[in-house]
Every structure is written in C-alpha cells, then in structure tokens.
C-alpha cells in the first residue's frame, strides 16, 4: 500500500507540474467556465431588463387623438341605427364638439356612417391610415345579461363593438398569455374609443359625467431576489440551465480526455507501465488532478447559482451534492471516451460535443411528461448528462409557482432520485473504465476478449491469480547448456560457470504467434536464451526478426503463446508486477513531456521507481543529469532539447532509481558519433549490478558495448556469444586497403600486387580497384602468416607504387550480413542479382524524357483518388458530414415551412365580460376614495351582476401591498381617485375617475374591468348596463409584413446559417489535407522531385472542386425539388454555389499555411469562415429589416455600401446574400418593392456574383504567389554578387587545394583524393549560408565559404556532427533554400539564374520520410515516376524493377504508413533514383535501417551511381567507407578535411586498435597481470576497455617512430601466444578520425572567424 501511495503522490506531482506549465490551459479552465456562467446571467438579466412598465398609463382626451384625417367609422347590422344607437353617436359628437369648442357640423366630418359590415371592412382596408377606429352595433335592441347576484333575473345592456386592426388588439382566442398584459389597449386607440363610447352612453342615459380612466399594471409581486429570476428561469434556465453548466464543466473533461490520449499517443503511459506504473494510481491521479481546478470552479458555480437565488427552493446540500457528483461522473466519462481514441486531435472536441448533445437530449426527456418516469430513471442511470438536465428542470419548476401547478409531479424525477442515479453512474462508470481498459485494443498491451468475465480461466488464473502449474515450476539455468550440447550447436559460445551463476533473465521455449490475414505468423519461435548480471546483452536481428516482440513479452506488453521467461526468478506469465518494479526502459519513442524540464523528468521517474527520500531523489537526479551530459540543461524543457539530447534523457530515465533490468531500444538513434561515444561510456560505467538488453542498428555500437550478442532471425536464435566469438565464427577475414602513389599512379600494376599477396595468402580476394585506392580481403585462416607477410609487404611498397596501407579486422556488421544472407537466401539472391540482371539494369536506368504537365496532373489526381478512397474518415468529414449539415438546413427550411406570424390576425369577436373571461371565482378588489367609501361601494356598485365578486378594501388597507399579497386571486382591480359620492350625489366634480389595474398575463383585463365598473355605475343610475365587444378588422399588413407574408423568416435565417456551417466545414476539411501534406513535407518532396508548383495546386483544386461540385449539385437538386423559388432561380443559385466553391477553397488553402495539423486546420478554418460569415450576415439582416421598417432610403444606401464591403471580405457572406435574395427574404427587397423583378440586377444578385468571381481570381493567384516567392527572391537577389567571408586561416591543405583548383577553373587532376579526371558535373564556389538570429539568438553560419567540385561517377560523402551544415548544404544544392552567397553550377547551369535547367537532372532523398502514408510503395513509385517524366509505357517496368532491387515485393501493396523505418527509407531512396537523374543528393538514407537493408542500399547506390554524381550524408562510418571515393568532415559549416577515406585515415589517424581474448588459464593468475604482460610488449598502448576475458587497446603510430603492422602481428603470434586465445588488429577507424576532427570548437577560432567576417564587411574608406 505504501508503494501505491508513493506512486500516487509522484503521479500527482507530475500531473500538477504539467498543469502548472500550461498557463494557457489553466486560464481556459478558469476563464471558460466563468464566461459560460456570466453568459447565463447575462441572458437572465437581459430577460429581466425587458420587464413591463409598472407606471400609471394616463389616457388623454378623445379630442386630442381624432381629426379629419383620423376618423371614426360606425354602423349597425340592421342597415340603420335605432334611436338609442343614434343617440349615443350624437352624444359622442356633442361631447367631442364641447371638448374641441367646435360646432356639431364641424365635428361631424370626424365621423362616417357605414351600415354595411362588408362595406365597412372594405373601407378600412383601403383607408386604414385615415381610420381612428370603428364602432359597430350588432343589434337594434338592448341585450339581456344574467345577473350573478340573482340568477333568476336579467338586466338590459347597451351593446356595442369596437373595431380596430386585429394587430392593435390582443388575441381574442386567449385569456392569458405569458409575458403579455393589457397595456396594448391603453397605448393604442382602444382605450380612447371605449372611454368615449361609455361616456356617450352615460350622457345619453342621463348620467352626464366625464370619465377619466387610466391604467396600470399590478405592482410587481416578485419583490424577493429569488422571485426576480422567475421570467428568466421560466424562459431560459429551466431548459438551458443544465446545458450552460455542463458546458462550463466540460472544459475539464475536454482537457482530461486530451491529456489521457496524448499520453497514450506518445507511448508515455506505455513506458511508465513497463517501469512499474500501477494503473489504478494512474487513473486516480488524473481524477484528483482534474478536480484540483474543477472542484473549486464547481463550487463557485454552486455559490453563484444558490447565492444569486437562481436556484432557491432546493436546499444547499442537494445542489452541492448534485453538482459535485455530476462533476465526478464527467471525469469518469472522460476516461471512458479516452479508451476509444488513439489520436488526440479530435478526442477532446468530440467528447465535449457528444456529452453536450446527450445533455440537450436530456432536456426533452426531462420535460416530456409522456415519457414514463421509470424510463427516465433508466436513462439517467446510463447517461449522467441526462440526469443533470432533469435535475435542473425540477429545481427550476419548484421556483416557478405559476408553473408547478400545471406539472404532473408523478412524471418528474426528484432531486434525490437524481443524486441516486449519479451515485449509480459513478459505480457503473468505474466498472466500465476497468472493463474497457481490459478489452479495448490498443497498439500495445495484452487485452482480454469482451466475454472474459464469463470464462473459467479468468476466475481461476487471471485477475492476478497465480497459475499453480507455473508457480511450482523451477527454472534451470543449465537447460540451455543441455540443449546446446544435445544439438551439437557450435553457434553458441559456452558461458563460464562463474558467469552462469549470475543469470538474471532466462528465456525458455518462448513462442509468440499472430493471426493474420495470410494465416498464422510465428514472430518468436521457441526461443531459449540466458542473460547475465553485470553484462550488456546485444539483441540483434533484421527488421521483423522478432526482437521487438521478444522485448514486448519480457516487459509485459504482449503475452506469450507458449513458453515463458524468468526475470530475477519471477515468471513473466503471472509475476509481471514484480518484474516491472525493477525494470527500466528506453523505447524507440521518446517517453517525455515537452513541458517538463530535464530535472523534473528525472525526479518524477526516480520517485516512480521507488526512491522516497526527497534529498535522495534530488541528489540522484542531479547525478544522473551530469552523467548523461545534460547537467547544463537541468532546467530546460524537454521539448527544447535536440533529438540526441532527448534520447539521453530517456536513457537517464531508464537507469535512474532501482532499475536492475534495463531495456534499451535504439538508444543512440539520431545521435552523431561523438554523442554515441558518450552514451557508450555511460553504459559501460553503469552496467555493474544490472542486466542491459540492447537493440541497435549500429553494429559497431553492439560490438563495442555488448558482452554477449544474440542474433535472431525469423524468431529463432541463430547465434549467441561474444563479439570476438562471432567474428571468428563468421568472420570473412581482414580488409587490406592500399593508397596508390600520386606521382606514379599510372605505373601501378594490380596484377603484380595481387600475385605477391597470393604467393603468401592464396585465398586473397580483390574487393575494389577505383581511383587511388585498391582493397583486398585476407582470410582469417591466414592469420599465422600475417607477421611475415606484412614484413615482406613493407619492404616492397615502393616497388608496388603504394604510399600507405591500412588493415582492419572483420566488423560485426560483416558478420551480421553474412548470417543474415545465409539465413535469407531469397534476400541474398535478390541482392546479388541486382548487379547482374541486365533487364533489371535497363529498367532502372530508364531516364526521364522531360517533365510533362499533363502527366504530372494525371498522377497527382490519381494520388488524390487513391488517398481519398482509402481514408473513409476524411471522406466522411469533407463530403458526407457537410452534406448532412446542409440537408439538415434544408429540412429546417421546409419542415418549419408554416408561416410564423409576428402580429395578431385573430378577428373573432370577444365580449369583455368578467364571467366569460375569468369565471365566477375571480375576485375584483376595489378601493374607493373619500371618507364615505364603504357607503359609496354599497350604494353605487351593488347593482352590478358581478357584485358578489367585488372585494371592498377600505382606505386603511395599503392597496398595492394587498395586490402583491393576493395577486393570484384576481385578474384586475379598481382604485377610485375621486369619491363617488361627490361625483354622483353632490354633482360637485362631474368627473368619474378611477384606475383600472390589470394583472400580468391577463391580456384582456383592462377593457373587461373598465366595462365592469362603467356597467355597474350606469345600472345604479337607471338599471341599464353596458356590453362592450371587440370585433377586429382584418390586419392591414405593413411593408415588411407584406414582404414576409407566406414565409417563415426564422426558418430562412436558420436555413442559411446552418447551410453556411455545412459549407464552412467543407472548406475547412479540404484545407486540412493541404495543411497535412505541407506539415508532413510531402509537398516539399514533390517540388524537389520536379513537380511544377502550379500543377500541384491545380490538381488539388480540381479534386476538391470535384467533391465540392458533387456537394453543390446535390444541394441544388434537392432545393430545386422542394422549393419553387430555388427551382425558378436554379441557374442563379447554381452559379453562385460554383463561384463560392471556386473562391472559398483557395482561400482555405491560404489559411492552411498557418496550421500544422489536419485537425487544427479543419477546425480553425471552419470556425474562421463560419464566424466571419455569420456575424456579417446577421448584422446585415438586422440592418436591412431596419431599412424597411423605417422606410429610409439613406439608411438603404448605407446598407448597400456595407453590403459591398462584406461581400469583399467574405465569400461565404456573398454566397449567403444570394440565398437571401432567392428565398425572397424581405430584407433583400428594395424599398417600396413587393417582389424582385430582376434577380440579375446590380441591386440584387449581380453584385455578390461579380465579387465572388473576383474572389476566385484573387485567392487562386495569391496561393501561387506565396509558393513562387522563393523564385522571385532568387531573381531579385543573386548570391553571386555577394562576397562570402574569407577562408579560415587554418584551412586544411586538401581543402585549400580544391578551392584553388576551382577558382582557377582548371580540370580536376588525378589525385589521391580520388577525384579522377574530367570536368565537374556539380560544383559550388564560396557557398555560404548565414541564418539571421531572432531576438537574443545570435546569427549562425550554417555553411561557411565552402568550395567543391564533383565529377561524374563519383560518390561524395558529407560527415559531421548534428548542426555541422550537412543538411543545409544538401538543401541549397536541391534549390530548397537560397544561399547567402556563392555560386552553384549543376551540369553547366547556374542554380539561381537558370534554376529549371539546373534542377532538371537533380533528385533528392531527404532526411525525412515524406511518404504519403495512404499509398503503397508501388503507387508511390508510380506517382514519382510520372512526376519525374518517366514515359508512361515504362513506368510499370521501372516500378517493378525498383521493388525487386529494394526487396519490397512482400509489402509493395501495403500502405507505406505501416512500414518500418528501414522500409520507408528504401522507398525514399527509390524515389530519389527514379528517372536516372545525373545528380542525386542523399541525406541520411540509412537512418533507422538494419545492416541488411543498409547493405542492400549500398549495393543500389554503388550500382546506380556509376554514371552519376551522388552526395551522401550519413552518421554511419561504414556506409561512407563502402560507398564514397571521396569525402569530407564538416564542423561549424567548414570542411575540415577532403580526400579518400584511406587518405584521411592515414593523414589524421592515431594508430591501430588491438582486441584480445585471454585464455581461461589467465583467470588463475588474474586478468590484470595478463594485461600487464601485453602492456610490456606494447609500452605505448592504452587500455580502452576490459571485461571478463576481453580487452581492447589502442596503439599509437607517431610519424616520427611509426609502428609496422608486421611487428604487431609478430608480437601477438609469438610473444603473447601463451596467454591469448584470440586477437584482432585494425587500423584506427574512420570514426576515431571523425571524433578527432569534430572536437569542441575553440573560442579563439570563433573569435578569429568573427574578426575576419567583420573585416570583410567593413567598406574601404578609399
């Protein structure tokens, strides 16, 4: 438990460090949720801002509103008015004349009698602007009204109807409406007509009083804070609250999913697992880490929601528990979603959107009462986002008193039930995480079948239970010895007893089988092998030999099919957890976090591996950092380290802590020889007490480091033993390399020399005779005669015209190749056949007949066809997903096709009766003014039929407070402002004044209660009441309403916005593939290979246009079928879509230059297009509607100008503009127009069409200009006119001689440098490249004033440390970057001024594998054949020839994305050699390749380079020696030497290397004493290494006292024969020369060079 606790703390520290380093991420986690919550409150506050007017609404006199242009029309159903009706109208005229102080005749013009209902309606339709209102009398007699006081009696009432435009009154079909009150009756003409009519009726029936009636909304009853949110809670929070809260919390889920998938993607989690990571600790650590920021934010959200009382009734504890549990379920969902992603680019986004979509579905599930509550609970148990939606719904409705009564609580889940589902969610999700982690397949690791829980094996053997059969099995270290003896296997070297007793790893009959489409494949075939403590064990083999599979089984990533292995006594089949506690690993992938520093990495892994003391962690980390040569980089983020430094950090991670079993997979990959040497020293110094398993493709590394070496092929152990054992067993002898004398090279006789050697060594073989060097192979069996032979050879050197010679022993690489080709006879036959098959040679040698645009275009289109067909996801994203979105927009457009009415068009009559409107239970509170109010109440209102519903309030009662406290009981109330007694009895005021207060949502309250009181007052006077009815006219449409009639404006807007989203997604996905090709350098390789830049863009445009055309054609056809407007304007819509596609795609390409991945590019470009387009579109919609509403031509002119600007800024906006025009959106019409007569006019579609055409041209030209900018810069700036800095003062003599030769333009002499004669096919003079530093970074001379000429047929090698200038040189020669100064000439053409001709015959194999992962090797080679201009009829032959030569036949039809690194390099090299180029630039061709592949590559390069110039850069010394007739070593951009390999070794070499193996008898006297005997024979020797019976020494060979090879062999074979079992001698290697010449740069050299540069740049004062 203590160990798990320690791991948990370590992982928490790591996670928190990562979180703290991501300042942007922390800001997002804090700011994003706050913004979301603030957005919720902004909406809620916005809803509250639109609160109604609570002030008193006063009505003015009728006379102030009516005039000759604003008349009253009146009439009756009977054709004429009866006496009472005519009397009332006359009374109205009379009262109006008194108010206006005019005569009756003058006032009469304000009235017009129309006694036909239809005629009145027609008149209103024609003259609506001149009609104040209408009055209609339906009956010629007084109507009867039932008396609610006494139901057996009826009373007479005077009936009339007021007629206004239906949009000036409220909907007669509704009694209540949320958010609407009676104020419209007061603000429009209704109140004036009703008051005037009632006043006229009063006057006619003898009650001559002026009516002053005002209106006021009920005082706001929501006085408490929680009540103030009711409107927002009802309209927003009830439904969308959970969405906002989920979105705020999902930022943490987004980040967590991304982090989890990134660690899976980068194999960091895999590496930690191998080194003992507990998976439960891993998951818990990430949950805690996420909660560190998520929980405080969650609590802040809770405090805001409860503190603001948006959530009021639900208790604090319920809200806290609900949201905390929900947050925890979201974190668990993050783990579940992360299981299904291998790449991080879409993981977080898709998780975010999916959970949010589930939450939105939960809104409908929670609110729909038709869904059974048990089904709701079940869904909540499965999906917690549904639960939170239901929770917010019930919390909200509890705080909406008017709503709760209408909800069936039996169909609503309670908060406590939801908490219960959350608890279940947590348990269920935890189980699901555990279950999915066991069954979901990943790239590495063993997984169970989905049904594993139902198997007997799992419950008896799995789940951590020990297999008793295996537990009782004792492994025997002597098994392998017995196997060897029984099989007489002399390929395995016996292990001494004292070493055998230190066995730490014992592999027994280990076997792994894989089921493939081709049947069963055996990756490891009954392997038996032992490894020992204190040793480095090299595990070698060609690609696919089973090395990685074996290591995967030893580390627990794979389970064996049969057999087992024991590591420190623990069985890998059931004790892997124990094994991993002592395991360290350095995978091929760098398992590091870019944000963390070197020191933080080491401290984390030290703690993870069991070191608990903080001081010890610190000291161990510092010590390790210094030992791996990163002491000066302690606080440098790992992402800023070079590739080699990252490998060193991974090495330190593997060794730090308690690791005793170390697996190193390609630990020195990507390092230069100097860095590799330092790593070797580190490994040798740390191997004590450890077992190190080393895999590498550098055989010299395995040779130098490994105590024992195992070579595996096809899953079987081929041989196992020390390096010397393998060399003696499989060695092919010594290599003798002789340098011919320069002055007498033409007198050299190869037959004479060969015969001399053959006389003493009969089996000698001539390997090569090229230029100034000749090489011989001397068999190992002739070792006893070497002493005499070399003595005789030394005496005859001058006779043979040989200046010097070198001797080297069989290398481990040669052993490896011999073993590999012995096993793989097919490979051997292919390799040997490459040079002899004439037909193969002819096919490979097919030359380019010239680059053809048509051929390139066809090839690039075929490439797009194949990649698109193989990548269904990209196809789905680029075509189907946008199509679905667009179809969705059309569905919205047509499914919501019913016209949305933004005005009231109800013309049903409505009688304003309290009984009819609000029933018998509605109470009418009434408060009268004056001291006699109660008397007045009983006297003057008791005759009302609704008197029983009146509620008298005396003056001591606070009227407003009463209404607030009892607002649910009444629809309206009355407050008299003048005592009725003074008005009706004393006749002192002649005014009846009261305020009619209307309750909110009761839309007809004001006219109902005015009619109620006026009816009561009149009845009290003479028993006659008043009945008022609303009889609306048909609505007269405004210009905007006419324009929008018959259409759903909302659906048009939604349709266009969603369609814009679809086409934005289309454009973004197309740009994603361009961004990906640029990031993966595919485009660069195409350009280097001769692809014309405009052809590249044309091919992409044509392909994307093709898909876009399909999309737009489907869109046009569907819209034409479902909508007549689009059918009528099909041509316009189709043209706009075509132009839009032609413009948006190149614009998206332009945006793609700023993004580095498909996911980022697609998402960002989609967002850019959509956001810009939508913002502009919505802004213009609002502006155009304002134009029509205000009928402003000046505003229309401004809109036109803005419209043009928007069209120019965004093609998407221009396209949307055309859609608006075609759809007939009212905002698209010109002022005064009811329809569009000419869609093609400039005021309509022509303007966006023309601008879209301009977009097409501009953006297409723009992307070409950007890509052709290097050419333009080259034409404007010629590097030949810029002087390079002067040559270094200490320049090597051979380098100076080459500079002088080229400057004099003399032909190349035949020299010892192997340059041969004839003219140079490639030469550069004064080549210099200075990179200008940015900020504080200094300028850097990448290449410093280099001069070189290379003739046809020569392979030239470039060596140097990382950053020496090799790749920069190759890039300048390839025309990829421009030199700062100097001249490059290729085949007589200047690279700058005659670029096309110079690069015509140049081909490049770049350092990177810029392969199209979705194409096979065959498809890839066919593509580049066409790019390079190979004739179409020859392409198939050429491709097949290269596939055969490179041994790619078995995988030629598989996508290159699945190839190993070596096979990818073979394809890249083949691409470079296609078309028989005259100059081939090969940059690190063998990087990541095993020796067999390197051997095959060397054969290909050697065979094909006979008539070419080849420049080769490499970190492999053996590769340079095998291929290059001339070479140089670069340091700080300068040539440090120049010549053949033997010339350079002779000139700069330090002597000879001697490797000896002592006899076992030496153990008795001690190895140190035996070593002392060797040193006495070689006094100047230095011991380089000693382990077991092996020792390596270096013998200096000073020029003043040279040592002869014959003397060395003589001493070894005579004086030391008694103590030596075996020995080997070789000249100082090229690698040692390399290390010598690439030592640290001296400060004085840098200062001197800087001074020379300054002197060169200072102008002459003369």
UniProtKB/Swiss-Prot annotation:
Gene Ontology cellular-component annotations: intracellular membrane-bounded organelle; membrane
Membrane topology listed for this record: Multi-pass membrane protein
Residue ranges of the TM segments: 30-50, 242-262, 284-304, 317-337, 346-366, 377-397, 417-437, 872-892, 1052-1072, 1102-1122, 1130-1150, 1163-1183, 1201-1221, 1246-1266
Keyword set, alphabetical order: ATP-binding, Membrane, Nucleotide-binding, Repeat, Transmembrane, Transmembrane helix, Transport
CDD domains linked: ABC_subfamily_A
Subcellular localization: Membrane
Signal peptide annotation: none
GO MF annotation list: ABC-type transporter activity; ATP binding; ATP hydrolysis activity; ATPase-coupled transmembrane transporter activity; lipid transporter activity
SMART domains: AAA
Family indicated by similarity: Belongs to the ABC transporter superfamily. ABCA family.
Protein name: ABC transporter A family member 5
């Amino acid at each position: 438990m203590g160990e798990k606790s320690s791991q948990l703390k370590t992982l928490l520290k790591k996670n928190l460090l990562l979180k703290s380093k991501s300042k942007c991420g922390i800001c997002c986690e804090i700011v994003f949720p706050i913004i979301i919550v603030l957005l919720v409150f902004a909406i809620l506050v916005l809803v509250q801002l639109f609160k109604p007017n609570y002030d008193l609404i006063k009505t003015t006199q009728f006379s102030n509103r009516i005039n000759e242009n604003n008349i009253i029309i009146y009439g009756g159903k009977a054709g004429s008015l009866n006496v009472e009706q005519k009397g009332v109208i006359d009374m109205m005229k009379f009262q109006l004349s008194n108010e206006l102080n005019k005569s009756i005749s003058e006032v009469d013009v304000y009235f017009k009698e129309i006694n036909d209902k239809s005629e009145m309606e027609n008149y209103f339709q024609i003259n609506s602007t001149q009609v104040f209102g209408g009055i209609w009398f339906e009956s010629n007699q007084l109507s009867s009204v039932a008396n609610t006081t006494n139901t057996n009696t009826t009373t007479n009432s005077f009936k009339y109807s007021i007629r206004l435009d239906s949009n000036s009154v409220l909907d007669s079909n509704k009694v209540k409406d949320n958010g609407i009150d009676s104020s419209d009756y007061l603000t429009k003409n209704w109140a004036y007509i009703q008051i005037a009519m009632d006043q006229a009726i009063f006057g006619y029936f003898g009650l001559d009083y002026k009516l002053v009636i005002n209106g006021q909304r009920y005082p706001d009853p929501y006085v408490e804070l929680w009540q103030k949110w009711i409107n927002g809670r009802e309209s927003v929070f009830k439904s969308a609250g959970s969405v906002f809260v989920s979105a705020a919390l999902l930022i943490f889920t987004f980040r967590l999913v991304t982090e989890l998938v990134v660690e899976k993607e980068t194999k960091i989690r895999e590496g930690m697992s191998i080194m003992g990571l507990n998976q439960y600790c891993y998951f818990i650590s990430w949950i805690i880490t996420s909660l560190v920021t998520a929980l405080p934010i969650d609590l802040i959200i809770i405090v805001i929601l409860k503190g603001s009382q948006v959530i009021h009734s639900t208790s604090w504890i319920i809200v806290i528990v609900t949201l905390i549990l929900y947050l925890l379920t979201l974190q668990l969902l993050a783990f579940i979603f992360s299981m299904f992603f291998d790449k991080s680019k879409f993981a977080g986004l898709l998780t975010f959107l999916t959970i949010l979509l589930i939450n939105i579905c939960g809104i409908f599930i929670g609110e729909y009462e038709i869904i059974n509550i048990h089904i709701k609970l079940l869904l909540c148990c499965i999906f917690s986002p549904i639960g939170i939606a239901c929770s917010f719904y019930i919390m909200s409705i509890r705080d909406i008193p008017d709503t709760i009564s209408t909800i069936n609580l039996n169909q609503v889940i309670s908060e406590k039930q939801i908490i219960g589902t959350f608890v279940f969610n947590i348990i269920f999700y935890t189980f699901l995480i555990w279950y999915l982690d066991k069954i979901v397949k990943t790239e590495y690791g063993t997984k169970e079948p989905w049904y594993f829980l139902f198997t007997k094996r799992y419950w008896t053997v799995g789940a951590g239970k020990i297999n008793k059969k295996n537990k009782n099995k004792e492994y025997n270290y002597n098994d392998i010895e017995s196997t060897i003896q029984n099989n007489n296997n002399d390929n395995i070297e016996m292990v001494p007893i004292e070493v055998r007793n230190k066995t730490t790893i014992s592999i027994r009959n280990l076997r792994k089988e894989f089921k493939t489409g081709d049947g069963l494949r055996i990756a490891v075939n009954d392997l038996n092998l032992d490894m020992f403590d204190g040793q480095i064990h090299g595990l070698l083999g060609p690609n696919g030999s089973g090395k990685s599979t074996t290591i995967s089984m030893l580390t627990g990533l794979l389970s064996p099919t049969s057999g087992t292995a024991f590591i420190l006594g623990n069985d890998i089949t059931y004790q892997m957890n124990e094994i991993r506690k002592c395991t360290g690993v350095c995978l091929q992938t760098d398992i590091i976090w870019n944000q963390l520093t070197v020191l933080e990495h080491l401290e984390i892994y030290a703690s993870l591996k069991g070191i608990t003391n903080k001081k010890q962690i610190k000291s161990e980390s510092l010590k390790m950092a210094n030992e791996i040569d990163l002491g000066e980089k302690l606080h440098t983020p790992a992402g800023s380290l070079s590739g080699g430094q990252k490998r060193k950090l991974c090495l330190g991670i593997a060794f730090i802590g308690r690791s005793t079993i170390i697996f190193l997979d390609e630990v020195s990959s990507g390092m230069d020889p100097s860095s590799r040497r330092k790593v070797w020293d580190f490994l040798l110094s740390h191997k004590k007490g450890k077992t190190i398993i080393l895999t590498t493709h550098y055989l010299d590394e395995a040779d130098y480091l490994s105590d024992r070496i195992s070579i595996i092929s096809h899953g079987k152990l081929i041989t196992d033993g020390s390096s010397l054992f393998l060399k003696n067993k499989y060695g092919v002898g010594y290599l003798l390399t002789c340098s011919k004398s320069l002055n007498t090279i033409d007198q050299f006789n190869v037959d004479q020399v060969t015969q001399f050697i053959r006389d003493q060594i009969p089996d000698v073989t001539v390997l090569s005779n090229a230029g100034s060097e000749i090489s011989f192979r001397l068999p190992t069996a002739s070792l006893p005669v070497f002493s005499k032979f070399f003595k005789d050879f030394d005496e005859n050197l001058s006779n043979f015209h040989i200046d010097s010679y070198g001797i080297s022993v069989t290398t481990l690489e040669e052993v490896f190749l011999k073993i590999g080709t012995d096993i793989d006879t097919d490979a051997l036959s292919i390799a040997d056949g490459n040079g002899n098959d004439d037909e193969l040679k002819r096919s490979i040698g097919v030359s380019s007949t010239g680059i053809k645009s048509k051929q390139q275009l066809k090839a690039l289109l075929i490439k797009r066809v194949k990649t698109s067909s193989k990548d269904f996801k990209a196809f789905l994203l680029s075509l189907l997903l946008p199509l679905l979105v667009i179809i969705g927009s059309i569905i919205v457009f047509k499914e919501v096709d019913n016209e949305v009415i933004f005005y009231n068009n109800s013309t049903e009559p409505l009688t304003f009766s309290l009984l009819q409107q609000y029933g018998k239970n509605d109470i009418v509170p009434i408060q009268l003014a004056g001291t006699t109010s109660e008397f007045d109440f009983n006297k003057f209102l008791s005759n009302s039929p609704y008197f029983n519903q009146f509620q008298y309030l005396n003056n001591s009662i606070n009227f407003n407070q009463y209404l607030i406290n009892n607002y649910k009981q009444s629809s309206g109330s009355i407050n008299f402002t003048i005592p009725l007694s003074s008005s009706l009895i004393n006749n002192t005021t002649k005014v009846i004044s009261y305020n009619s207060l209307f309750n909110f949502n009761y839309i007809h309250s004001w006219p109902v209660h005015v009619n109620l009181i006026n009816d009561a007052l009149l009845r009290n006077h003479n028993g006659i009441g008043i009945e008022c009815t609303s009889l609306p006219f048909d609505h007269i449409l405004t210009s905007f309403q006419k324009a929008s009639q018959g259409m759903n404006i909302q659906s048009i807007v939604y349709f266009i916005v969603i369609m814009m989203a679809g086409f934005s997604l289309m454009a973004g996905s197309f740009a994603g593939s361009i961004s990906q090709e640029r990031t993966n350098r595919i485009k660069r390789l195409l350009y280097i290979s001769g692809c014309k830049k405009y052809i590249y863009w044309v091919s992409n445009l044509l392909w994307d246009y093709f898909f876009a055309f399909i999309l737009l054609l489907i869109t046009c056809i569907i819209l034409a079928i479902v909508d007549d407007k689009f059918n009528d304007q099909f041509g316009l819509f189709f043209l706009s879509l075509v132009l839009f596609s032609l413009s948006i795609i190149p614009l998206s390409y332009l945006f793609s230059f700023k993004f580095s991945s498909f996911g980022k590019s697609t998402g960002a470009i989609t967002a850019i297009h959509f956001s810009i387009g939508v913002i502009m579109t919505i802004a213009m919609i609002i502006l155009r509607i304002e134009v029509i509403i205000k009928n402003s031509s000046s505003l229309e002119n401004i809109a036109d100008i803005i419209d043009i600007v928007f069209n120019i800024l965004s093609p998407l906006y221009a396209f949307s503009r055309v859609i608006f025009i075609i759809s007939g959106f009212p905002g698209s019409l010109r002022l005064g127009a009811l329809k569009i007569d000419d869609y093609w006019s400039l005021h309509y579609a022509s303007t966006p069409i023309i601008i879209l055409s301009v977009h097409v041209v501009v953006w297409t030209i723009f992307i070409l200009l950007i890509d052709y900018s290097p050419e333009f810069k080259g034409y404007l700036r010629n590097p030949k006119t810029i002087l390079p800095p002067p040559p270094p003062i200490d320049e090597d003599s051979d380098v100076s001689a080459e500079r002088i030769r080229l400057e004099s333009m003399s032909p190349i002499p035949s020299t010892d440098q192997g340059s041969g004669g004839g003219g140079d096919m490639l030469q550069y003079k004064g080549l210099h490249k200075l990179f200008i530093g940015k900020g504080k970074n200094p300028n850097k001379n990448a290449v410093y004033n280099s001069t070189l000429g290379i003739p046809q047929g020569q392979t030239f090698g470039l060596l140097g440390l990382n950053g020496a200038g090799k790749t920069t040189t190759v890039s300048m020669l390839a025309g990829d970057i421009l030199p700062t100064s100097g001249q490059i000439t290729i085949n007589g053409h200047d690279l700058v001024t005659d670029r096309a001709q110079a690069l015509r015959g140049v081909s490049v194999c770049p350092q990177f594998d810029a392969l199209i992962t979705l194409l096979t090797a065959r498809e890839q080679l066919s593509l580049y054949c066409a790019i390079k201009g190979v004739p179409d009829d020859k392409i198939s032959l050429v491709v097949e020839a290269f596939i055969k030569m490179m041994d790619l036949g078995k995988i030629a039809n598989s996508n290159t994305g699945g190839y190993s690194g070596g096979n990818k390099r073979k394809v890249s090299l083949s691409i470079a050699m296609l078309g028989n180029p005259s100059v081939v630039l090969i940059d690190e061709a063998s990087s990541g390749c095993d020796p067999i592949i390197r051997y095959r590559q060397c054969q290909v390069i050697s065979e094909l380079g006979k008539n070419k110039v080849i420049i080769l850069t490499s970190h492999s010394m053996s590769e340079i020696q095998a291929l290059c007739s001339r070479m140089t070593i670069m340091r700080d951009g300068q040539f440090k030497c120049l010549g053949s390999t033997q010339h350079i070794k002779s000139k700069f070499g330090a002597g000879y290397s001697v490797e000896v193996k002592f006899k076992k008898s030496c153990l008795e006297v001690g190895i140190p004493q035996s070593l002392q005997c060797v040193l006495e024979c070689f006094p100047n020797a230095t011991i380089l290494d000693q382990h077991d019976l092996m020792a390596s020494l270096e013998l200096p060979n000073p020029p003043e006292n040279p040592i002869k090879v014959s003397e060395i062999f003589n001493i070894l074979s005579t004086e030391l024969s008694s103590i030596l079992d075996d020995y080997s001698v070789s000249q100082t290697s090229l690698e040692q020369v390399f290390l010598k010449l690439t030592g640290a740069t001296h400060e004085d050299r840098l200062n001197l060079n800087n001074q020379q540069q300054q002197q060169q740049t200072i102008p002459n004062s003369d």
